[in-house]
Amino acid sequence: MSRINKFVLTVSLLIFIMISAVACGIYTQMVKERVYSLKQSVIDTAFAVANIAEYRRSVAIDLINTLNPTEEQLLVGLRTAYADSVSPSYLYDVGPYLISSDECIQVKEFEKNYCADIMQVVKYRHVKNTGFISFDGKTFVYYLYPVTHNRSLIFLLGLERFSLLSKSLAMDSENLMFSLFKNGKPVTGDEYNAKNAIFTVSEAMEHFAYLPTGLYVFAYKKDVYLRVCTLIIFFAALVAVISGASCLYLVRRVINRGIVEKEAIINNHFERVLDGGLFFSAADVKKLYSMYNSAFLDDLTKAMGRKSFDEDLKALPEKGGYLCLFDVDKFKNINDTFGHLLGDEVLMKVVKILKSQIPVDKGKVYRFGGDEFAVIYTGGTLEELLSILKEIVHFQVGSINLSTSIGVAHSNECTTVERLKMLADERLYKSKKNGRAQISWQ
């Protein structure tokens, strides 16, 4: 695995871990808050029920203080008051009842009478208290409030309704669990199993006088929590994969662009990046181009220099091609007769002619110094090369006729580059010996 792939994999893994941890952490905190909100809903529900029960008691007390009624008159007054102010159906299932030490009277006339059951269960009939009472296979929370020294009102609320009302006030109620235990046995609420619950909170609630005594258990459904966390992890993995693939694509594009720019500069194709690139600005490219020219090009003729020649000559046996060595005939006499300025013009003219004839991908022109030149030709036949070289055998600069002597050798003729260079030099000498202004290749 390459360093790039390892880097991208590490980044993707970090993205996955970060998203999973943060998202699951936020979701976990939300679930815990919902469990605590359910606990608060139970407290608020009980408080609301107690307040309404207290209000009903105050109605009875107002009747007593205002009219000082008999028991029959009190009962009629209560029934009239409750007829004018119907109790909320979502709160009360049964009652209220007016009880004393030895008597229980049903306030509402058209309900089933549970007085006998109430008198058997409720022991403290003249002290404000709450508790549980069961009859007809149902369990109720009762709220008992004294209205006189020997009479009290008792209100009943079905535990199932109490549980539903409490959960309806909490968010995400369908996934919350609420159970009430009395003496270790479940009284109401959801069927609680520790294996199926998570973030369980339990409290006796003894410090709330308006709540029936018991163990209140609140929790969240474990399967729902795990399912949501699994979805979060899957989403995090998907984001990590997409991010990793995108990162890998971009990194590879950047690297490939860098390779293109590097090869363009190394191979002297500065025109491809002359306007700047991803890694090199236009100013950088121009500076590199200038440095390249100084190191590899002849300042006067812009032919390749000795360093480039040595490198390309080493590669010639593998590529296969021709080495040509040549110089300008009687160049010293030209300098002495017409001066160095004309001599420079002659040298530049020779290089210009060859560059115009040799395709860039087939060969290069080199200058060693003075009037000594070379051509390495790797892209064509001997006939094509001779056709090109004939352009400089005879040429003119102004009105002056000039010529060159050339020696040509093929890489297949020698086993080493040193011997190849010697063979081309021998054929150059042969051209000079035979009268100059000619090409020798045999």
Swiss-Prot record:
Residues 1-23 form the signal peptide. It is an enzyme of class 2 (transferase). Mg(2+) binds at D327, D371. It is found in: Cell membrane. It is a lipid-anchor. The chain crosses the membrane at residues 231-251. InterPro entries: Diguanylate_Cyclase, GAPES2, GGDEF_dom, Nucleotide_cyclase, Rev_trsase/Diguanyl_cyclase. Its cofactor is Mg(2+). It comes from the Bacteria. A lipid is attached at C24 (S-diacylglycerol cysteine). A lipid is attached at C24 (N-palmitoyl cysteine). It catalyses: 2 GTP = 3',3'-c-di-GMP + 2 diphosphate. The record marks K332 as: Transition state stabilizer. Pathway: Purine metabolism; 3',5'-cyclic di-GMP biosynthesis. SUPFAM superfamilies: Nucleotide cyclase. Residues 319-442 form the GGDEF domain. One of its GO terms (biological process) is cell adhesion involved in single-species biofilm formation. Substrate binds at N335, H340, D344. Binds 1 Mg(2+) ion per monomer. GO terms for molecular function: diguanylate cyclase activity; GTP binding; metal ion binding. The keyword tRNA-binding does not apply. Homodimer. PANTHER family: DIGUANYLATE CYCLASE DGCC-RELATED, REGULATORY COMPONENTS OF SENSORY TRANSDUCTION SYSTEM. Catalyzes the synthesis of cyclic-di-GMP (c-di-GMP) via the condensation of 2 GTP molecules. This is Probable diguanylate cyclase DgcI. It comes from Escherichia coli O157:H7.
